Regions:
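A short, structured surface patch at a secondary-structure boundary
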Residues: 20, 37-103, 108, 203, ...
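His/Asp/Glu-enriched short active-site or ligand-binding loop at hydrolase and phosphoryl-transfer sites
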Residues: 63, 188-211, 231, 260
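Short helices/loops that flank or line small-molecule/ion binding pockets
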Residues: 86-93, 115, 214-223
Length: 344
């Protein structure tokens, strides 16, 4: 009954633009309008990319957790990432909806398709996926010039980082997505990719899960040289508090004071991911970036950032982690676990 009502509402939209069939990053064939003017984003990373491409004026709606840049918070919201409101999406009369396969449910795409609203899906497993998505969005949204310029600039920055860390010894890195229970980033994730390109080795790259849990004992056995936390008050209590947690003081990295809080851009598969790459590389290889690995790189709270990085309190919004791990999903979406379980 709901779909019938929404279908009637969808028919009331303005006459459809001329469209072309494209294959999105998930392999789906999508009827994408030529030069779409009304866009709805179902993921914060997509919202950030649209603004980076200069398309903020075309964005007519996004999710509750799209908070960067600040203008994104002023857009009409269509709900959370896992379970957006179809009614709100239809009411915005979008020409095209943009989503991420790993975060948005296939059911949402299918329902929108039945309503005649195309959804273009992206993927975000690696840093290269993030850069490729910029080019793909440029083609889908008819803004190739801006997309090419942005992608090339970001690739130059990546290449410069890789040039600086080439030949350097690779420290072992534990990235803490969640500290109780301990959850980290496994292989085939953009976080692991950032660590590798920054000249490190993730201690969890041999694990099968993309977002594996680790016992403290297992993490201690892997003996990381460096431990990284994202700058979020819930995920990253003050480092002094971490050091006092049972078992944590046994880490060699703790004894050597090599705990760092890094910018939350590391969990956003958007152009800002390159900011995180540069920061992590400078932490792991300060000599290659003419910086001392001193307390200026240690962030005591999410109100502070390393030099050259935003000091804004960013929401740990959403990424491909969403459907993989309940506690991680709660962190990414800001939803209580009970609500996530109900949505699933």
């Amino acid at each position: 009954m709901l779909l019938i009502f929404l279908g009637a509402a969808a028919l009331a939209r303005p006459a459809a633009l001329q469209a072309r069939v494209v294959v999105d990053e998930t392999g789906r064939r999508v009827n994408v309008p030529d030069h779409p003017q009304r866009l709805v984003s179902l993921a914060p990373s997509i919202t950030e990319t649209l603004y980076a491409l200069g398309l903020g004026d075309r964005l007519v709606g996004d999710t509750d957790y799209c908070d960067y840049p600040p203008q994104a918070k002023l857009k009409p919201h269509v709900g959370n990432v896992l379970n957006p409101s179809l009614e709100k999406i239809v009411a915005l009369k979008p020409d095209l909806v943009l989503g991420i396969a790993e975060a948005n449910r296939r059911q949402t795409a299918d329902q929108l398709q039945r309503l005649g609203i195309p959804l273009y899906g992206l993927t975000d497993h690696t840093l290269d996926d993030t850069l490729r998505s910029i080019a793909d969005l440029g083609r889908a949204l008819d803004c190739n010039v801006a997309a090419t310029a942005l992608e090339q600039n970001l690739r130059r920055r990546v290449a410069e980082v890789e040039r600086r860390v080439a030949g350097e010894a690779r420290p072992k890195v534990l990235f803490v997505v969640w500290h109780q229970p301990l959850t980290t980033a496994g292989p085939h994730t953009f976080i692991s990719d950032v660590i590798h390109r920054a000249g490190g080795v993730s201690i969890s790259d041999d694990l099968k899960s993309e977002w594996p849990g680790l016992t403290l004992e297992a993490a201690l056995d892997r003996d990381p040289d460096v431990i990284l936390f994202p700058s979020h008050v819930e995920l990253s209590p003050p480092l002094d508090e971490i050091k006092r947690l049972p078992g944590w003081r046994e880490f060699r990295a703790v004894k050597q004071n090599r705990l760092y809080v890094v910018s939350e851009s590391i969990i956003h598969p958007s152009p800002r991911l390159i900011d995180a790459l540069e920061q992590v590389a400078a932490i792991l290889h300060p000599e290659a970036f003419a910086m001392a690995a001193s307390d200026e790189w240690r962030v005591a709270s999410d109100e502070q950032q390393a030099p050259g990085f935003s000091s804004r309190r960013e929401g740990f919004a959403c990424s491909s982690l969403a459907t993989r791990h309940l506690s991680l999903t709660a962190t990414l979406t800001g939803l209580p676990p009970q609500q996530i379980e109900a949505a699933q």
